[in-house]
From Swiss-Prot:
<dbReference type="InterPro" id="IPR017772">
    <property type="entry name" value="Cys_deSase_NifS_bac/arc"/>
</dbReference>
<comment type="similarity">
    <text>Belongs to the class-V pyridoxal-phosphate-dependent aminotransferase family. NifS/IscS subfamily.</text>
</comment>
<dbReference type="InterPro" id="IPR000192">
    <property type="entry name" value="Aminotrans_V_dom"/>
</dbReference>
<keyword id="KW-0411">Iron-sulfur</keyword>
<dbReference type="InterPro" id="IPR016454">
    <property type="entry name" value="Cysteine_dSase"/>
</dbReference>
<keyword id="KW-0479">Metal-binding</keyword>
<dbReference type="GO" id="GO:0030170">
    <property type="term" value="F:pyridoxal phosphate binding"/>
</dbReference>
<dbReference type="GO" id="GO:0009399">
    <property type="term" value="P:nitrogen fixation"/>
</dbReference>
<dbReference type="InterPro" id="IPR015422">
    <property type="entry name" value="PyrdxlP-dep_Trfase_small"/>
</dbReference>
<feature type="binding site">
    <location>
        <position position="236"/>
    </location>
    <ligand>
        <name>pyridoxal 5'-phosphate</name>
    </ligand>
</feature>
<keyword id="KW-0808">Transferase</keyword>
<dbReference type="GO" id="GO:0046872">
    <property type="term" value="F:metal ion binding"/>
</dbReference>
<feature type="binding site" description="via persulfide group">
    <location>
        <position position="324"/>
    </location>
    <ligand>
        <name>[2Fe-2S] cluster</name>
    </ligand>
</feature>
<feature type="binding site">
    <location>
        <position position="150"/>
    </location>
    <ligand>
        <name>pyridoxal 5'-phosphate</name>
    </ligand>
</feature>
<feature type="modified residue" description="N6-(pyridoxal phosphate)lysine">
    <location>
        <position position="201"/>
    </location>
</feature>
<dbReference type="GO" id="GO:0006520">
    <property type="term" value="P:amino acid metabolic process"/>
</dbReference>
<protein>
    <recommendedName>
        <fullName>Cysteine desulfurase</fullName>
        <ecNumber>2.8.1.7</ecNumber>
    </recommendedName>
</protein>
């Protein structure tokens, strides 16, 4: 049974061309790029080429690219750098729907005397820019907001946000881990000061990422040690990972226009067909301002985990919109922030496509999903009894 992988917002397949580019740096070219000898110099050249490739994808200058180990490091580095550069300012603005790499840092900073404003979202997952405007003060050091939400695909009006942030003199950081390769970017004309990307979301290996730091932005490094990355990120460079990220960035730039069209068409077909065939389901998130590859659908009166287990039997990989873990039945913080009813929250499934997704794969999901939902609803003691479902959820949460 072949795998149908529709969980690309979690991670992506490494492109074969990326694997080919990496291999020599795992076998033949193993020197240290900081070394003075020719062998090390070859590695230094490879790192410079990759930096240029990443810069081209972002519409940035290569001197503005700092290689990191992942998106989480990039987010941490950007947030800490912004605060260290402005020690007199103690206020941060973010949103309720950020990735934990941002939210948990902000929560920790609250214990260190910082004040954090968590902007709300509406039922479509969009921000109220008037709330942002009212939250900005002269004490605001940093505004950190994701470009696109990883669960719903909702895209925020980043340039409008950035314009308001810059008018108030704060640093603007954007977690673009989900946006890069799915939305064309041009940092040369952007209001963004710092921007995070992660390799494994764009068909590069895990363990490599990059942080864009606009020229002129004061930057204090998170990792202290050697002189690597022009003193902005200490530690011997992960050359194979960097080469892989560079190649992946080059490929994303080549394929982005055709990928957007293909993914949008396949996503819309999947979404519209499931909505037509399955009663009591709805799309979670903004259906106009969103990533081309992402749909999050709530199937009422059943658990998302049960849907995922059923899909898994057919070799179909997706993700639950519910962040349920052992011992907890609380759904994802993103969907809760949107104010969705429990009947939808718990049965939400995210399908996230990529340029490798095929028509036949979408056909297969369309074929099996109606039967899965019908069977699970038949097993549910509540079926379409919304009051009974809500009562059961309240009782469960009351005994946690």
């Amino acid at each position: 049974m072949s795998v149908i992988y529709l969980d690309n917002n979690a991670t992506t397949k490494v492109d074969p061309d990326v694997v080919e580019a990496i291999m020599p740096y795992l076998t033949d070219y193993y020197g240290n790029p900081s070394s003075m000898h020719t062998f090390g110099g070859q590695l230094g050249k490879a790192v410079r080429t990759a930096r240029e490739q990443v810069a081209a994808l972002l519409g940035a200058d290569e001197s503005e690219i700092v290689f990191t180990s992942c998106g989480t490091e990039g987010d941490n580095a950007a947030i800490r750098a912004a605060l260290l550069a402005q020690p007199e300012k103690r206020h941060i603005i973010t949103t309720q729907v950020e990735h934990p790499a941002v939210l948990n840092v902000c929560k920790q900073l609250e214990t260190q005397g910082y004040t954090v404003t968590y902007l709300s979202v509406n039922s479509h997952g969009q921000l109220d820019l008037d709330e942002l405007e009212a939250s900005l003060t002269g004490n605001t050091a940093l505004v950190t907001i994701m470009y696109a939400n990883n669960e719903t695909g909702t895209v925020f009006p980043i340039e409008e946000i950035g314009k308001r942030v810059k008018e108030r003199g704060a640093i603007f950081h954007v977690d673009a881990v989900q946006a890069v390769g799915k939305i064309p970017l041009n940092m040369k004309t952007s209001t963004i000061d710092m921007l995070t990307i992660s390799g494994h979301k764009i068909h590069a290996p895990k363990g490599i990422g990059a942080l864009y730091v606009r020229r002129g932005v004061r930057f204090r490094p998170l990792l202290i040690g050697g002189h690597q990355e022009r003193g902005r990120r200490a530690g011997t460079e992960n050359v194979p990972g960097i080469v892989g990220l560079g190649k992946a960035a080059e490929l994303e730039l080549i394929h982005i226009e055709t990928a957007i069209k293909k993914e949008t068409r396949l996503r819309d077909r999947l979404e519209q067909t499931l909505l037509a065939k399955i009663p009591d389901c709805e799309v979670n998130g903004d259906i106009t301002q969103r990533l081309p590859n992402t749909t999050n659908i709530g199937f009422k009166y059943i658990e998302g985990e049960a849907i995922l287990l059923s899909l898994n039997k057919y070799g179909i990989c997706a993700s639950s919109g519910s962040a349920c873990t052992s011992g907890s039945l609380e759904p994802s913080h993103v969907l809760r922030a949107m104010g969705l009813p429990y009947t939808t929250l718990h049965g939400s499934i995210r399908f996230s496509l990529c340029r490798y997704t095929t028509e036949a794969q979408i056909d297969r999901v369309i074929e099996v999903m109606p039967e899965i939902v019908e069977r699970l609803r038949a097993l549910s003691p509540f079926k379409n009894d919304e009051a009974g479902w809500l009562q059961a959820q309240e009782q469960t949460l009351a005994h946690r």
